[in-house]
Amino acid sequence: MRIVPRLTVVLYFLVLVAACSSTPQTVPEYQGDYLDRAQSQEKDGIRVTAAVPSAAESKAIFGKPLYKRGVQPVWLKIENNRDEIVAFLPVGLDPVYFTPIEAANMSLKDKKKVSDKRSLINEQFFEAGMINNVPAGEQRSGFVFSRLDEGTKAFNVDLIGDSGFTPFTFFIPVPGLQLDHHTVDWKNLYPADQFLDLSSDELIEKIESETCCATDKGGKGTADPVNLVVIGTPDEVYYAFIRAGWDETETIYKGSSWKTIGSFISGGEYRYSPVSALYVFNRGQDIAFQKARANIHERNHLRLWMSPYRYEGEPVWLGQISRDIGVRFAKKTITTHKIDPDVDETREGLLENLAYSQALAKVAYLGGVGEAPIDQPRANLTGDPYFTDGFRLVLWVTSHPIDIADIQLEYWRVPPDRQSIP
């Protein structure tokens, strides 16, 4: 009796399901400015092009305010240059994606009782949906209706065939938000003669002599501890943190202010709310990320400042991370958060977050913050107490997935509670 390998069986059923669930039609390519922002990748005989329409573009295409319903269409074109059929797996793009007809009927007005049983069958959305199977030598294009992610949309496009599994990862900026880091000119952040290429010993000395904490604008008040060092290009930093589930943040303007106030009052989630400025190198943070939890009162905040230092050709950033456990109104920044006093727990949580997200290449520790025992805590600008072992976590981030088992350890310094770790 011939035993069929398990992978072959899985491939067979996936391709069969894709073939049965899709008709071999060619969906027209919808025109629009979003196609000018399309990105293409090619691997192992397959070329994938992806684009993400903005809220206005989505409404123009489909005639419905999809973003207001939490639906974000992602346009794909898959060109199969192999001699075998391949199947696109939409759950890789979004595990709980919407079907085309589901996306068409998500407003409350569409859910009223109807007498015409065909009224819920929206042929426009159905015809626009992505076809899952792509025969050899052919191409297919269409939309996948995913959950809404404003700012930079990060997603996978996974394909499977007899030759195996072929994954693609995209990070596509979507117009609509006024993001803080979009105004930063990275190339001219410092004069050219201020950039320093450092050896490991020189970097250790520089980092450990940097300020312990961020400050207020005047440089006088002591804010939260600068407990992170990140090494990587701006793009690697964006992609690593977005891959790990962090959201970009908006600047403070009228629109973001109203959204923040609304979230504060309702306790709702505003994933991209502005982050108040703290100062290192005499300027506010260059990038801020946040990870929302249940509501605006509970989230993690992360700030990064690019330093003038370079290590092995890569930019070195100083950073600060805190876990917010409450919120109150503030005169200058609309709201301000109360932080969890155990800032080391939050720091280590970031290490685990990046490692599990395959966004981390190497890790180390350095001093520089200064110890603050639990019985002698320090306070930040708003009077919130915190305690720490005084170490800075050094993270080499990557935009290319790295297995958690392949993360390297650099033993520059070892915190006391990790002395026994080999």
Features from the language model and the residues they span:
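Low-complexity, acidic Ser/Thr/Pro/Gly-rich terminal tails and inter-domain linkers that flank the onset
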Residues: 28-68
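Short, hydrophobic/aromatic beta-strand segments
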Residues: 84-92, 155-157, 238-242
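A cross-kingdom signal targeting lumenal/periplasmic-facing segments of multi-pass membrane
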Residues: 79, 254-420
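Bacterial signal peptide processing site
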Residues: 21-24
